[in-house]
């Protein structure tokens, strides 16, 4: 979202490469959130064994109060969860899957919309091949040492971890209300935010949860898990370019707009992103402050944009000229930007200092 152009032909390749890690991080954050909320999904025996069925408050203080117990939780639950997220689509690289995706001669666009039968076949091949890769390709690590007792404990522990990864991959295929949602919901979210499809539309990313809640209504995933992820990410994904109307201490709007970048998770309100400002007084800056952008000042919302459209065309042209040296080339984008592409800004190394001191 920051360094990758979001409006050219290379988007799909970059998104495909970034998606597994993006999904893995979201799965970790979602697991933490569900543990804090005391979700029934975290009461499955394997997970509960390592967090000792802690209450939400206890889980938040887990690392501080029980360093060894938390480290065990990381090794036995969190790392296997990351493995599952990273491996979830590894079966797509199986030759049979590649024949479907790319064609026998590699002549087809791998990011095209697949026919229903091809998609079903691909899902089956992916699952079988992923499990085979996990069990026969990776397997459990080998104990190195001379203690028979330690070896027995090590082998039993690693076998349980491997079975947990396998169970998560299986549960994510059709999770319904089960533990597989910890993988499935971030998978759906990532497939939209980092879409590889030709109809990818950056402007529509803040509507991602419309699709997720629709999936929940159809029984594809758990509504409560969708809601939990929504509270983590908010409506606006990290790295999204927000265009907003600044106002003074009396709440009076300025006759200009400014740019900001969504930089944090866990907004208090899902429609009020936590951002780092990228412009001040219509000039790009490399060190901005954190602000929460109220929906009443966010040009993403049509009502706010319509209200602000009372500005004259001359003033809007003036703003564009002050912000962009190539404003003539940007005219096709319109004078009233509802969002902005942050890669333009982050392509300059000095501007990457914007991340300094982010909480």
Residue ranges and their predicted role:
Residues 88-89, 187-190:
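DG-centered beta-turn motif at the end of beta-strands
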Residues 1-17, 21-24, 31-52, 107-113, ...:
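Terminal helices and disordered tails flanking the catalytic cores of nucleotide-processing hydrolases
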Residues 1-128, 132-148:
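Acidic/His-rich, divalent-metal-binding segments that scaffold phosphate/diphosphate chemistry
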């Amino acid at each position: 979202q920051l360094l990758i152009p979001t409006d050219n032909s290379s988007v799909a390749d970059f998104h495909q490469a970034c998606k597994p890690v993006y999904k893995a991080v979201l799965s970790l954050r979602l697991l933490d959130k569900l543990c804090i909320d005391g979700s029934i999904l975290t009461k499955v025996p394997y997970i509960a064994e390592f967090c000792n069925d802690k209450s939400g408050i206890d889980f938040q203080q887990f690392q501080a109060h029980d360093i060894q117990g938390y480290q065990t939780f990381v090794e036995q639950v969190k790392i296997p969860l990351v493995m599952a997220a990273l491996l979830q689509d590894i079966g797509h690289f199986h030759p049979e899957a590649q024949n479907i995706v790319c064609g026998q001669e590699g002549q087809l666009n791998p990011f095209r919309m697949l026919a229903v039968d091809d998609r079903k076949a691909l899902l089956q091949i992916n699952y079988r091949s992923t499990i085979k890769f996990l069990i026969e390709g990776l397997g459990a690590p080998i104990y190195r040492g001379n203690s028979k007792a330690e070896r027995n404990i090590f082998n039993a522990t690693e076998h349980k971890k491997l079975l947990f990864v396998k169970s998560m991959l299986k549960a994510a295929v059709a999770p319904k209300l089960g533990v597989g949602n910890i993988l499935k919901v971030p998978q759906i979210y990532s497939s939209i935010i980092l879409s590889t499809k030709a109809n990818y539309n950056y402007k529509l990313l803040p509507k991602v949860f419309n699709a997720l809640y629709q999936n929940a209504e159809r029984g594809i995933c758990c509504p409560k898990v969708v809601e939990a992820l929504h509270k983590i990410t908010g409506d606006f994904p990290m790295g999204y370019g927000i265009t907003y109307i600044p106002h003074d201490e009396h709440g009076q709007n300025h006759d200009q707009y400014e740019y900001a970048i969504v930089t944090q998770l866990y907004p208090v309100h899902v429609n009020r992103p936590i951002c780092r400002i990228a412009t001040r007084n219509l000039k790009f800056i490399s060190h901005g402050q954190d602000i929460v952008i109220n929906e009443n000042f966010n040009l993403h919302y049509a009502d706010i944009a319509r209200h602000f459209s009372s500005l004259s065309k001359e003033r809007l042209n003036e703003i564009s000229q002050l912000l962009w040296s190539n404003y003539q080339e940007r005219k096709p984008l319109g004078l009233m930007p509802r969002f902005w592409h942050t890669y333009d800004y982050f392509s300059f190394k000095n501007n990457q200092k914007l991340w300094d001191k982010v909480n």
